[in-house]
Amino acid sequence: MRIILLGAPGAGKGTQAQFLMGKYGIPQISTGDMLRAAIKAGTELGLEAKRVMDEGKLVSDEIIIGLVKERIAQDDCKDGFLLDGFPRTIPQADAMKEAGVSVDHCIEFDVPDDVIVERMGGRRVHPASGRVYHVVYNPPKVEGKDNETGDDLIVRDDDKEETVRKRLAIYHEQTKPLVNYYSAEAEAGNCEYHKLDGTRPVEEVSAELAERLG
């Protein structure tokens, strides 16, 4: 089972990715993790990527797709995989298809921008431990304080409204077109497309995923 997850930052992809990995026994392939691993291992692609990154440039689609192909050839991907953070653009999706990397399911988590801003803006983090709270969904026992240590909680820059709205603008411009791309792929019989309402409770979304994917 080869799965791609689509959805804006904060739409709940990470949470559902954990559920899918556990249920279907497939690894999550994150382009960030792959890049770090390839650089650490000193592979040809890793060295090439490091050179580009050291110059402060973006790693090309060719390098990323090379890494994806290497990664999915490994044993733990024989039953499938979950692609996270890739493809992000139509050229990447085209290049992936040309490289012979097919997809069985494309899952879109649909969440309005304002809901995402509320979700992410409500996050509070304990920097030392990485514990994450939410003022609405998972509040600390004492407002603004970590449950275990009593230390002050912070709002990460990434979770501030201005930053979130910038990231959402990039998503709508670059990645949202993939919704149409994979919908068309599904109509052509190349994959199945699933659009889920990501505003519902986590358990409900997981249950619907399990039902749809079988």
From Swiss-Prot:
One GO term (biological process): AMP salvage
One Pfam entry name: ADK_lid
SUPFAM superfamilies xrefs: P-loop containing nucleoside triphosphate hydrolases (SSF52540)
Binding annotation for ATP: 10-15, 123, 132-133, 200
GO terms, molecular function: adenylate kinase activity; ATP binding
Keywords, sorted A to Z: ATP-binding, Cytoplasm, Kinase, Nucleotide biosynthesis, Nucleotide-binding, Transferase
Cited InterPro entries: Adenyl_kin_sub, Adenylat/UMP-CMP_kin, Adenylat_kinase_CS, Adenylate_kinase_lid-dom, P-loop_NTPase
LID as annotated region, ranges: 122-159
Top-level lineage group: Bacteria
Gene3D superfamilies: P-loop containing nucleotide triphosphate hydrolases
Region feature (NMP): 30-59
Entry-linked CDD domains: ADK
Family assignment from sequence similarity: Belongs to the adenylate kinase family.
Function text: Catalyzes the reversible transfer of the terminal phosphate group between ATP and AMP. Plays an important role in cellular energy homeostasis and in adenine nucleotide metabolism.
PANTHER family xref list: NUCLEOTIDE KINASE
Protein known as: Adenylate kinase
